[in-house]
């Protein structure tokens, strides 16, 4: 009997090992095929974009050289325009459109895409005015001086207003590095701000909005704005010694992305704001930007059990995800 039992256990163990190796081979095949497909697709996309970039590169290079001639000897003014004024123009233009929706509720169809239904319909005008004043203060008294002080460091490291524009592939590499640096610095600074010592005096201000809107992406205590909003975005260009053109695009993109993350609407063809919206709702989940460090540290486990996680995808149609993936019906007591 013992021999038969041992033989059966051995066979069962062999079958399990076979299943494991089979699963590993299938996984390797799927991942390998997926990786090859992604590389082929990426090479195709970048080839076409590179052709466009190259074809228009002469035009942009000529315009850049014209700007250098215009601001010769006053490159710091050009840096100020590119690193501060242009990103701010993008920020307020985008938020201006969102504020029309937030304050009037029009166009009506936008409300179908609201993440937290019934919240900010319409937004409290007193609370909104206070938030806008804080955002303007942070931009004028924190963001502007930090970017101004950034210029001499960049000038010493590698002139941001150098004559030659970066290549397309170099900018893609920079963008990837900027994003990774931002993820690390924002995640850990954000978690630190949730420590009771700092939360009550500093970070609580930002969490006054449990259902966020776009403009409050920069609504924060000045210390938080400097440490958690500005530094994670600034460090990347400083490390890379980036060209002003890269800095302008990166700062503008960062402001647009953080606005989308806070806007409160899961709109078609825009990045999903479900992740950060859930953070404002629950406070102790989803601290990062990409979600990579949240996954590694287990600070997204509750989020992954929700409908918000199922909806955390790029919406490629016009049917709101709250309708295609509705909330589970509440249990009757």
From Swiss-Prot:
Protein name as catalogued: Fatty acid hydroxylase domain-containing protein 2
GO biological process, one term: positive regulation of megakaryocyte differentiation
Family of the protein in this entry: Belongs to the sterol desaturase family.
GO annotations of cellular component type: cytoplasm; endoplasmic reticulum membrane
InterPro entries in the cross-refs: Fatty_acid_hydroxylase (IPR006694), Sterol_Desaturase_Related (IPR050307)
GO MF, one example: iron ion binding
Membrane topology: Multi-pass membrane protein
Annotated compartments: Cytoplasm; Membrane
């Amino acid at each position: 009997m013992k021999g038969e039992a041992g033989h059966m256990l051995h066979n069962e163990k062999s079958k399990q090992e076979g299943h494991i190796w089979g699963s590993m081979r299938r996984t390797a095949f799927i991942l390998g095929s997926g990786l090859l497909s992604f590389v082929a697709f990426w090479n195709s996309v970048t080839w076409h974009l590179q052709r466009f970039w190259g074809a228009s590169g002469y035009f942009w290079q000529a315009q850049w050289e014209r700007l250098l001639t215009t601001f010769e000897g006053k490159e710091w003014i050009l840096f100020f325009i590119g690193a501060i004024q242009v990103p701010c123009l993008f920020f307020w233009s985008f938020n201006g459109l969102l504020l029309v929706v937030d304050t009037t509720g029009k166009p009506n169809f936008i409300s179908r895409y609201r993440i937290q239904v019934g919240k900010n319909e319409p937004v409290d005008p007193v609370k909104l005015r206070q938030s806008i004043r804080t955002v303007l203060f942070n931009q004028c008294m924190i963001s502007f001086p930090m970017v101004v002080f950034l210029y001499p460091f960049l000038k010493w490291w590698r002139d941001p207003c150098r004559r030659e524009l970066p290549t397309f592939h170099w900018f893609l590499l920079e963008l990837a590095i900027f994003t990774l640096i931002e993820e690390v610095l924002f995640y850990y600074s954000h978690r630190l701000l949730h420590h009771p010592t700092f939360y009550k005096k500093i970070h609580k201000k930002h969490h006054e909005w449990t259902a966020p809107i776009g403009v409050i992406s920069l609504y924060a205590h000045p210390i938080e704005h400097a440490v958690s909003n500005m530094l994670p975005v600034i460090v990347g260009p400083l490390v890379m010694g980036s060209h002003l053109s890269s800095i302008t695009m990166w700062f503008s993109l960062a402001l647009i992305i953080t606005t989308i993350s806070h806007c409160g609407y899961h709109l078609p063809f825009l990045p999903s704001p479900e992740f950060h919206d859930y953070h404002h709702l629950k406070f102790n989940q989803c601290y990062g930007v990409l979600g990579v460090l949240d996954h590694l540290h287990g600070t997204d486990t509750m989020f992954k059990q929700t409908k918000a996680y199922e909806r955390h995808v790029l919406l490629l149609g016009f049917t709101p995800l709250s309708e295609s993936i509705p909330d589970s019906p509440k249990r009757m007591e």
